[in-house]
A protein has these predicted regions:
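Thiamine diphosphate
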Residues: 1-157
Length: 159
């Protein structure tokens, strides 16, 4: 299982300072850890996912740093407009790291309302050309930390 402290430290060592998003049940541990270990100026709980993306964009434009935006996969529909009309490499080329809680993941028992969104999550990310890595519960903390580092580096090279 991924150690929250190690994963958070990996993000910090990769230069992530701002954390913003909409908490979800699958991300409750990392969200609680962020709240306990980040100043209120660097952890902004957003009213919706699109606003969180916009906050991340503003942070990057002001600091040239990569923000982390967290959300549940049901919020992906809310992030499409600001991602494609502002953050996209063809527009303002704003790098950011998305941490998406995957409800309705195929072959994992979940509530009926999450099943369709879960089925199309990776297809949706592929359609809008968002590269992703899946963090599994079996993944070691070290491997998850390496994924975080790699994704922050990738965010800069894509933009």
């Amino acid at each position: 299982m991924v150690n929250t402290d190690y994963f958070f430290s990996s993000l910090r060592h990769s230069g992530v300072e701002l954390f913003t998003g909409v908490p979800g049940s699958l991300l409750k541990d990392i969200c609680a850890y962020i709240t306990d270990n980040t100043s209120p100026d660097n952890h902004i709980i957003s009213a919706n996912e699109g606003s969180a993306i916009s906050i991340g964009i503003g942070h990057h434009l002001a600091t040239n740093k990569v923000p982390l935006v967290y959300l549940q996969n049901s919020g992906l529909g809310n992030v499409i407009n600001p991602l494609l009309s502002l953050a996209d490499p063809d527009v303002y080329s704003v790098p950011m790291l998305l941490l998406v809680g995957w409800r309705g993941e195929p072959n994992i028992k979940d509530e009926p309302q999450h099943l369709k969104q879960g089925k199309v999550t990776t297809d949706l990310l592929d359609a809008i050309k968002i590269p992703y890595e899946v963090l599994s519960p079996e993944m070691s903390s070290e491997d998850a930390g390496e994924v975080a580092k790699k994704m922050v580096e990738r965010a800069f090279t894509l933009n």
